[in-house]
Amino acid sequence: PGVFNQESGLRRLNFRGYYVVGLEKVGELITVGTLRVFGNQVAELPLVGTRFAHRRQGMCRLLVTELEKMLRQVGVRRLVLPAVPELLPMWTASLGFHAMTRSDVMEMAVEHAILSFKGTTMCQKTL
């Protein structure tokens, strides 16, 4: 296992500033996410995954809650992420995110080169 970070002259391929955040339970990695922070304006959480045996037990909620606390402490004001249709209700109703407007998504893509994936809804939360 490892954490890789690669800077590139191509903006869409620049992985500088990416971090891996994880939640462990008794030495076992349970939930992980990739995080990229753009100064104090915005942080992006494009990928989150939980081991199958630990799904539907609040592990993602715990990871995101702790991540939000850390981001607030360093002055980050907004967290954005792409939500797949099946999990959109979790992100919005349960975790307090809101779907972004198309113009907000376009603006964010231009300013910060955030990742969005086909078939997902970009969501944001003010911290």
Regions found by a protein language model. Give the residues of each.
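Terminal substrate-recognition subdomain of acyl/acetyltransferases
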Residues: 1-30, 36-42, 69-127
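A short, internal acetyl-CoA/4′-phosphopantetheine-binding micro-motif in the GNAT/acyltransferase core
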Residues: 48-56
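Conserved acetyl-CoA-binding loop-helix of GNAT-fold acetyltransferases
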Residues: 56-69
